[in-house]
Each structure stands twice: as C-alpha cells, then as structure tokens.
Amino acid sequence: MTLASIFVLYSEAIITKVFLITAGTFGTMAFVGYTTKSDLTSLGKLAFMGLIGIIIATVVNLFIGSSGMDLIISYIGVAVFIGLTAYDAQKIKHMLAMCPDGGEQAQKLALMGALSLYLDFINLFLYLLRIFGRNND
C-alpha cells in the first residue's frame, strides 16, 4: 500500500486520528530510546526477528487470506516498530557520539539514521491504520 492510496481507502478522520496517535507514540519512543541508560541492543535484535516473522507471516497470509491473521500481524507490527523506534534512536545517538568532529562521516550516519526513523514512523502509521481502519469498515 502506498501512502497516496490511504486517502482512497480510509476516511480523513481515521487518517488524522491515526497520524496523531502515531506521532505521539513515535515521539515518546524516540525520546525514551534517546534518553534511556539501558542498552537496547537486545530489544533491537528481538524487534528485527519480529520483523522477519512479520514478513514471513504476511507472505503466508497472502495465500491464506485470513482477516484474523492480518489483525494479529498488524498488532505485532505495531509492537515491532515501537521497539525499533527506541532502538534506532539510541543507535543514532551512539553512532554520532563516535564522530565528535561532525564531519562527512557524521553526516552520512545522520542521514542513515533519519531514514531508519522515517521508515519506523511510516510502518508504525500503516500498521495502526490497518488496525483502526478495520474497526470502521
């Protein structure tokens, strides 16, 4: 599903509601990931394994076509991308701390980190949209 198609599939009210929920959740988890003293590496590994599981389950569900399985995948997707948001925020902080001069390497790391967080936000938004959009069909 592309971002343009959501305006055809969902109402403006649902899109707005889900966007606000996503923004709040994303901001909170990015803040937690950035400020926590705990090492989130194990959370990142767990979330990555969950992401692989989501991909496999989605492919299987293409053949099965179960709406219940789709809902379960969506809830797991939300949990995975919440975890990845916190992990990626902490990872960016640690990577940029290793480049105190702020040179070209730091700019490349910042760009890659921004892309990771962008993908976390978009995927979190899409999974939440699938959950909330289902309730209003």
Predicted features and spans:
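A hydrophobic alpha-helical transmembrane-helix feature that marks the membrane cores
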Residues: M1-D137
